[in-house]
């Protein structure tokens, strides 16, 4: 009996140690962007049009609802393809869906040729009304890569990708044009140049005041 208890204790401790080790390798980051649109306009694209993310994402070439899902909502599922052969993909599920707060958590339950561990990969989407026809779109992500040592390197790439996603969302809302891998380079220049010009104007005003 004592031997059995010892074995069970060791198994439990071992499981806890593995879980703790896995959690330590989880990477997190949070990015946000103020957009010149109402919160309702932004939410319509990132929340209500969940299955059509390919229309407003620079890397996803095709997306759709799966497993009987017909629209956004609690438990809605989608697939996102990142290459023409559809071998690189993410299957995702929407949970904690709150249209009142304009927020949801996006979980990954299957990854095809994509270096993330679905069990430890998820992101919280949140749209906040800032008034005057503007809103803030924030993206709070945690993930673990496979292999785990790639996490630190992948973190920077993921942050850049989400910042590009913000630009794609902005362009899609403004023009109605679908964003693709092919046209995003041109699209990005339009918005990055405008932001740089705006920053320069602020600096010029500041220097003039001095």
Where are these regions (language model features)?
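Bacterial Sec-dependent N-terminal signal peptides
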Residues: 1-25
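Hydrophobic ligand-binding cavity/cleft-lining segments
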Residues: 18-67, 197, 201, 205-210
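A short, structured loop/turn motif at beta-sheet edges
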Residues: 36-40, 95-103, 126-136
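Hydrophobic pocket/interface hotspot
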Residues: 41-46, 53, 78, 94, ...
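Glycine-rich portal/gate segments that line the openings of hydrophobic small-molecule binding cavities
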Residues: 64-116, 171-176, 183-210
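Beta-strand/loop substructures that line and gate deep hydrophobic ligand-binding cavities in soluble
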Residues: 110-164
């Amino acid at each position: 009996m004592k031997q059995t208890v010892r074995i069970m204790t060791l198994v439990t401790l071992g499981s806890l140690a593995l879980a703790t080790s896995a959690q330590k390798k989880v990477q997190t980051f949070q990015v946000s962007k103020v957009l010149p649109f109402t919160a309702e306009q932004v939410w319509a694209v990132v929340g209500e049009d969940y299955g059509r993310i390919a229309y407003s994402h620079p890397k996803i070439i095709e997306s759709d609802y799966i497993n009987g899902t017909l629209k956004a909502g609690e438990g809605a599922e989608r697939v996102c393809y990142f290459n023409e052969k559809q071998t690189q993909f993410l299957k995702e599920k929407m949970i904690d869906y709150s249209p009142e707060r304009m927020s949801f958590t996006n979980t990954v339950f299957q990854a095809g040729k994509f270096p993330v561990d679905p069990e430890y990969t998820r992101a919280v989407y949140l749209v906040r009304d800032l008034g005057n026809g503007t809103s803030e779109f924030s993206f709070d992500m945690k993930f673990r890569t496979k292999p785990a040592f790639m996490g630190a390197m992948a973190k920077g790439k993921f942050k850049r990708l989400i910042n590009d996603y913000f630009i794609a969302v902005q362009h899609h809302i403004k023009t109605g044009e679908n964003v693709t891998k092919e046209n995003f380079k041109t699209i990005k220049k339009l918005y990055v140049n405008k932001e740089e010009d705006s920053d320069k104007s602020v600096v010029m005003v500041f220097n003039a005041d001095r």
